[in-house]
Structures are given as structure tokens and as C-alpha cells.
């Protein structure tokens, strides 16, 4: 099972809609900021904490960049 199949199956298991390709990219961009400005463990935990808030992915990305001290966005992920 590849990553997209696993994500789709996990979403179905918990009764959620699977993320779109754009949403996956945004989550990975958020994880990258967290991991690159701290330690690797920050990536999944930041995504979980952000998800608990209900904030948009754009708001979470901006917050991560403020915390990480980055003013650039990732277009290469």
C-alpha cells in the first residue's frame, strides 16, 4: 500500500474525507518548516497541534514560519 492509499484508508477508517493533493502539499510544507527549524520530531507534533486548532493550513504555515524565523515559503516540496 502506498502513502496515498494508506492516507485514504485511514481517512475512511476515522470517517473523514481524505486530503486533496494541495492539502497534502501544504501539510508537508508545514512539517518541513517545523523539522528544519527544530528537530525532526517537531514535524508530526506541529501538524497534530495545528490540526487540533481548526486553523487553516495557510494560518498554520504562517505561524510555523514566525516560530521558525523563516520568511520564505517552500515551493519545492
Describe these PLM feature segments.
Residues 4-10, 19, 58-77:
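C-terminal binding/interaction regions
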Residues 17-55:
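Amphipathic, hydrophobic secondary-structure cores in small proteins
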Amino acid at each position: 500500500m502506498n502513502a496515498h492509499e494508506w492516507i485514504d484508508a485511514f481517512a475512511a477508517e476515522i470517517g473523514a474525507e481524505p486530503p486533496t493533493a494541495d492539502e497534502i502539499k501544504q501539510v508537508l510544507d508545514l512539517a518541513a518548516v517545523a523539522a528544519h527549524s527544530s528537530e525532526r520530531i517537531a514535524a508530526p507534533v506541529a501538524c497534530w497541534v495545528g490540526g487540533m486548532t481548526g486553523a487553516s493550513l495557510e494560518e498554520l504555515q504562517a505561524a510555523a514560519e514566525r516560530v521558525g524565523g523563516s520568511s520564505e515559503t517552500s515551493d519545492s516540496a
